[in-house]
Amino acid sequence: NSIFSGLMPLQIEKMFPELWVDEDSEEGKNLNEAPLIQTQIERFRKKYTFSYHKVHDSQYNDKLLIIVPSLLHNQLNVVVLNFVDMLSHARTENKMIRELAQSEAAYRSLTRSWFQHSGTLELFKRIAGKGYKVIVTTDHGTIRVDNPEKVIGDKNTNTNLRYKVGKNLNYNPKDVFDIRFPDKAGL
């Protein structure tokens, strides 16, 4: 959400509590991306018109291709491509994807192949062909972990594989990057 709001998580929680989703909440954490973009535009006192689209499948991408002319009336169009995120999760959860993406090179190749044959490449070409800038960014990368570190916590510790939040966490401090005071890091 920081990439959309231009703020650190702690700032989002303080400035826009209605858009903040706590770590232990059952609610999806990415449901407020469009309103967070709006808050950033307003904070910088811009009068931009914008659109927000989250592409979960090729059918939605095809719809975007059809409405490109209407998108060009906006000063900003945000398109979230969920495929790479879904692929990174599937790499740990799906045996077939694990077979296809056994190495980092294979994973990148699979991602590249998807991009070259997806409607996303055509979408970018159409937008760029009209003289508009296409900026591609990411909210996080992916690292394949071969030797995970064990972090043990109580029953209230979150289950996220990328990071742990909780009290009384036990781990080897030589092998884990920890932030003891998350608020000082803006988290």
Language-model features: locations:
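Feature captures the catalytic ectodomains and active-site-proximal regions of enzymes
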Residues: N1-L187
